[in-house]
Amino acid sequence: MKKYLLIISLWLGIGFSNAQPLSGYYDSVDGKKAQAVKTALCDAIDEHTQRTYKDLWADFRTTDCRPDGKVWDMYSSITHYVFGTDQNTGGGGREGADYNREHSMPKSWFHDGYPMYTDLFHMYPTDSYINNMRGNYPFGEVGTVTKQSNGG
């Protein structure tokens, strides 16, 4: 029992120690109230740079790179994709042909609108064939599996 409490305590301690905002990030909000707080917060995030759909290819090199330098595909165990070389070549007629960009929430749900369309927090490199097969279905549990990707 002591072992479990120690592990939980360490886990919580590490989690909370990393959950601190950048030093000075909220300084402009200190002492303000109501509308002034809203304005100060808006000003703090005003320098956000909206990514283009094309920018995501380069962003994936940082966000979804495996330790061996290959693309981290969330749908398939076919993991030989090379950044730049294997990105959406227009193929995708079979699993393992190439990878493309996947929205975690179907883009039709927000009418392909910006900034959601290129929000990197909701974008993943995925096997093109499996991504196209998924269509606009939400993530969730299914009663009967009709198609399953390699390892998925």
Say what each PLM segment does:
Residues Y4-G13:
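Sec-dependent N-terminal signal peptides
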Residues L6, D68, E95-D98:
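A short, polar/charged loop/turn motif at coil->beta-strand junctions and beta-hairpin connectors
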Residues T89-G152:
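Domain-level detector of nuclease and nuclease-like folds
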Residues D73, I78-D98:
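Short, His- and charge-rich active-site/binding loops that engage polyanionic ligands
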Residues S17-H80:
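N-terminal module-boundary/linker segments of secreted carbohydrate-active enzymes
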